[in-house]
Amino acid sequence: MESFHTRFSAWTPFSNKSLNRQLFQERVALISHWFDLWTNKQRQEFLFAIFLRCTKSQLRFVQDWFSERMQVAKVDFSTVLPRFISLYIFSFLSPKDLCAAAQVSWPWKFLTEQDCLWMPKCVKFGWFLPYTPTDNEYGAWKRHYIACVSHLDWLTPREAAATYGTLNEPKTEDEELLERQREKCLRKRIWEKIALRKKELFKVRPPWVSGTCCSSVLKPRCQPRLSQTVRERVGLHEALEKQLVLTSLETLPKRSNISGSHSYPLLSKKNWHGVHKNDDRSSYALRPHFMLISSRIPAYEMVMESVKAGVVSVVYEHSVTLESLLYLIEKALDGQKAQSIGIFSDGDSREINLLQGYKIGVKNLLRPEVRDFWEKLGSYVATEEEGGHVDFFVPLGASEAGIEVLSQLSQLTGTFFTAPTGIATGSYQHILSDWLGSQWGKAPSSIYFCESKLQTWSSFTDFLEETLKTVRKQLYPFFKELQKSISGRMIGQFMFDTMGMTNILNNQDTAQALADGLMELSKEDSERNVVEDNSWDTKSRLSKNDLNFEALINLERILQKDSAEKRARVVRELLQSERKYVQILEIVRDVYVAPLKAALSSNRAILSAANIQIIFCDILQILSLNRQFLDNLRDRLQEWGPAHCVGEIVTKFGSQLNTYTNFFNNYPVILKTIEKCREMIPAFRTFLKRHDKTIVTKMLSLPELLLYPSRRFEEYLNLLYAVRLHTPAEHVDRGDLTTAIDQIKKYKGYIDQMKQNITMKDHLSDIQRIIWGCPTLSEVNRYLIRVQDVAQLHCCDEEISFSLRLYEHIHDLSLFLFNDALLVSSRGTSHTPFERTSKTTYQFIASVALHRLLIENIPDSKYVKNAFILQGPKYKWICATEIEDDKFLWLSVLRNAIKSSMEK
């Protein structure tokens, strides 16, 4: 019985441990069974009662047990929690934080791109997706949000006033009331036309109702003619058609990546990594220099290749619009601000020939679209306090009008504008002259360009452009798949490698030695040619002329001593350039005319007297006129002083320009006569071969020498503007200078118009020749604006909405946009065995007048991108460009061309 002795419990034996253990386990099992049968509340009460009975040591034991068993699990909550909880957590993040969270891991990226997170953020701003994503597609709303945010329009004060009415400027009339009145007048006119048409049709009764009782009442006293009725109907139709065309233009997107109208590009890596960075100091330190290059610049590929590494450069076509040019700049800068912007385009000392139809000058600088362009351009460059500046590679600093343009642009944008003074004459030599207001201790050209390459380009611009026309034609088939900027740089590098002129420019001693050697060789060749021809001694004639020019050279040195007087420097440049020009004309007389006349007088005629008269009569008269002008300048400048005048001499010269008019009128006949004589007279061919492109002729041929009269007037105009710029307002010469400038400017416009007409005619002939079945394109004032290659699509079912339509590619088209019509042609490609390049052929399809062309944009969807509709009176084309930029640029240019054609 001793073994069953108990203590503190009637059920637990004290001394028998095995029995004690057995009984304890049975009772624990019994309590556990009861615990399992209890409810949750009963279990909680039981645990509470047990813990109240426990001592501190027992409670500490429970705490230690929980701390050992309950270890903290370091796992990603998005992989453990249900998806709806994770999405609920992510819904509290901002769009910027969601983009940053997407870079953490793939589960986070998948969750943060769900449409349920991004759709409310888009709908909040009214950015609706143009199509419904499929079940297995995600991220569409995120891409839509990013596209809308990254391409938000920055409104200038003028645009904000037009949109929201926030610009407090006095208005002459209520715009809304004016628009309402205009619509009312249009509706009234349409209804009047319709009523008149019904009335006229009612009066013109058919013959079978002439015997009715009411025929005598309805029969008018004067029957209207059928042509009158037709004219009324045509007038009504034209008014409605014009309104319809204008409405279609207004519905086109005016910005790239507008919500629901364009594709939604993914963020670039730079933007992804920069989501959480917002350091203005770092962005200021990394601001790039930006260079804008016009395709109108001769040999622009070599200018592209001259751009320094690290400078962002863009080549734009001269035919684009201001809106398209801003888009190209915005895309190239990619949200950054440029430290400086350089604009390398065509122009003169008064205006910038920035785009086709936009010569920026004092007269049109404040036009709304031009002003908005410069305001937005100024927002892309750093402020003047931060060292930002805009550099025009156009000699605006050489005239009062150009300086006024720079001043107005600075006031308009708050940015510093600078340009070369243009003292150095010649083809684009002004970029090497002094710059107006340069504050950086060096010319702005050294900021953007490798100066040795740029100097090479500027020295041989005219020759390089002629050469590059052939190079482009030969290399384009190989580079047509590349971007234009890349292919342009490759062609420019090819030209520099072929020329090999950079090392010569860097080594002046070598260049001088080479020039001396070539001069000695030319003297020997000239003497040998004289012996063979037994004709005119060219060298002796030139040596006599050198005596006359020694006095001019001494006079130039005297004027050069007064370097502080800017007016004297410009006059010296006028005298020096005129001397060089007369030398060029005397080369024609001494090298070509004199030997031909000597051969004719010695009964060994190379050309007949009639042909010599046709080819050289006008150029010799020009030589006589300019020789007299040079003598007058020399006599006036023998004792030059601040009070002396040159305007009177130039005015007298400008009143005798009929000599030049005769030359330009006969210019085509002169060139054709040279070509005919070269082909038909072997002796003349040999004569030209012996004298063309020698050192005596400055490596020029006879047709190239005849180009100089047309180019001289641009130099006259720039120099006269520079003289007037540095002439005080009270000076006696100022009035004569203004008269002379007007004379030269008017005559230069006449030359430019002739040149433009010939160029347009040749260009239209080339297009007509390459398009099979093309009608006659040559018309007055017609010119080509742009050529765009597109794919023609066919819609399988036009009854469904745009977002669900399926398209198939059926043809390749080329669209030739003229200023008055659109020519549509099919484009075919043919390959030759064993050849990599292909041949492109064009087949005429149709032409549509621009004022009858309707345009409709097709929003991007999963099935089609960059598409639009062109519809004429008889045809309809669904077109698509290969890239988004081409569509935006094409629609912008087309819209501008249609508006211009309807305003005529």
Swiss-Prot record:
Residues 75-121 form the F-box domain. Keywords: Guanine-nucleotide releasing factor. Residues 566-754 form the DH domain. GO terms for molecular function: guanyl-nucleotide exchange factor activity. May act as a guanine nucleotide exchange factor (GEF). InterPro entries: DBL_dom_sf, DH_dom, DUF4347, F-box-like_dom_sf, F-box_dom, GEF_Ubiquitin-Prot_Reg, PH-like_dom_sf. The keyword Transcription regulation does not apply. This is Epithelial cell-transforming sequence 2 oncogene-like. Pfam families: DUF4347, F-box-like, RhoGEF. It comes from the Eukaryota. SUPFAM superfamilies: DBL homology domain (DH-domain), F-box domain, PH domain-like. PANTHER family: EPITHELIAL CELL-TRANSFORMING SEQUENCE 2 ONCOGENE-LIKE (PTHR46857:SF1). CDD domains: F-box_ECT2L (cd22173), RhoGEF (cd00160).
